[in-house]
């Protein structure tokens, strides 16, 4: 299981939001590239980048920073989400050295786009499913739909999706612990590899997630916990390696 540091980009800076609220952000660094360097030095094997401005604007806003991080670490798999709603944007990111793109809102509103993207860019597409009480949220979490997370994931089982990033938005940035049961259930019922996100707080969460790795949980994204020191990235990754 991979422990994946999150670098959330807002106005060119590395921030964390609480429950997706743009007006409730904490700036962790003015230099996201040096932030990436810190996590690479701590043993990160993949980075999770989010263009927060892009998620709300519906198109990339912090693309230059994403490209700079990809250029600085050409051998490091990077996944990017936020405002990816066109095939040419996916192409731009992949050309810049990003390995995976995360399709969120567009996957809910236009599932055929995911299939089209998977055909055009095999192995590079991740679907981001953000859920509140099991129901999918879109538009930077501003809207909650009538589609369940499990039903949405099942739609993409045969599309060629690389994995699902599943975020429980009630827990994101709140340091309340990860929703292990819902994450494992999504992996089992969809048959797709799932990366957990939202609420990864400490080593207890990592240990609990590791117990369901056999269900198809292949990674955990962590943000606030590693920035504030509640979780040590190297310790968490070493633990996961030791039980694999």
Swiss-Prot record:
A Pfam family it matches: His_biosynth
Q: Does the keyword Isomerase apply?
A: yes
What are the protein's UniProt keywords?
Answer: Amino-acid biosynthesis, Cytoplasm, Histidine biosynthesis, Isomerase
Assigned GO CC terms? cytoplasm
**Signal peptide, first to last residue:** none
* Pathway stated in the Swiss-Prot or TrEMBL entry: Amino-acid biosynthesis; L-histidine biosynthesis; L-histidine from 5-phospho-alpha-D-ribose 1-diphosphate: step 4/9
- What are the EC numbers? 5.3.1.16
Example GO molecular function term?
1-(5-phosphoribosyl)-5-[(5-phosphoribosylamino)methylideneamino]imidazole-4-carboxamide isomerase activity
Family annotation (InterPro entries): Aldolase_TIM (IPR013785), His_biosynth (IPR006062), HisA_bact_arch (IPR006063), Isoase_HisA-like (IPR044524), Isoase_HisA-like_bact (IPR023016), RibuloseP-bd_barrel (IPR011060)
Q: Where in the cell is it found?
A: Cytoplasm
Active site as annotated: 8 (proton acceptor), 130 (proton donor)
Q: What is its main location?
A: cytoplasm
Tell me the Gene Ontology biological-process terms attached to this UniProt entry: L-histidine biosynthetic process; L-tryptophan biosynthetic process
Q: Does the keyword DNA-binding apply?
A: no
What is the reaction catalyzed?
1-(5-phospho-beta-D-ribosyl)-5-[(5-phospho-beta-D-ribosylamino)methylideneamino]imidazole-4-carboxamide = 5-[(5-phospho-1-deoxy-D-ribulos-1-ylimino)methylamino]-1-(5-phospho-beta-D-ribosyl)imidazole-4-carboxamide
- PANTHER family attached to this UniProt entry: 1-(5-PHOSPHORIBOSYL)-5-[(5-PHOSPHORIBOSYLAMINO)METHYLIDENEAMINO] IMIDAZOLE-4-CARBOXAMIDE ISOMERASE
Which family does the record claim for this protein?
A: Belongs to the HisA/HisF family.
Name of the protein in question: 1-(5-phosphoribosyl)-5-[(5-phosphoribosylamino)methylideneamino] imidazole-4-carboxamide isomerase
Which gene codes for it?
hisA
């Amino acid at each position: 299981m991979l422990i994946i540091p999150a670098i959330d980009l807002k106005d060119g800076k590395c921030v964390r939001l609480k429950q997706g609220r743009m007006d409730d952000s904490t700036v962790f660094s003015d230099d996201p590239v040096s932030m990436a360097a810190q996590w690479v030095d701590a043993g990160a094997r993949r980075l999770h980048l989010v263009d927060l401005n892009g998620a709300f604007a519906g198109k990339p806003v912090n693309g230059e920073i994403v490209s700079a991080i990809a250029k600085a670490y050409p051998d490091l798999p990077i996944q990017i989400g936020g405002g990816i709603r066109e095939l040419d944007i996916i192409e731009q990111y992949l050309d810049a050295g990003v390995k995976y793109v995360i399709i969120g809102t567009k996957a809910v509103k236009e599932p055929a786009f995911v299939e089209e993207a998977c055909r055009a860019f095999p192995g590079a597409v991740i679907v981001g499913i953000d859920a509140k009480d099991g129901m999918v949220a879109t538009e930077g979490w501003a809207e909650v739909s009538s589609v369940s997370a499990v039903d949405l994931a099942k739609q993409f089982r045969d599309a060629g999706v690389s994995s699902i990033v599943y975020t429980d938005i009630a827990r994101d940035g709140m340091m309340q612990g990860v929703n292990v049961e819902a994450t494992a259930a999504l992996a089992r019922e969809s048959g797709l590899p799932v990366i957990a996100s939202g609420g990864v707080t400490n080593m207890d969460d990592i240990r609990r997630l590791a117990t369901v790795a056999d269900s198809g949980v292949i990674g955990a994204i962590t943000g606030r916990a590693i920035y504030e020191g509640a979780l040590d990235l190297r310790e968490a990754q070493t633990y996961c390696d030791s039980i694999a």
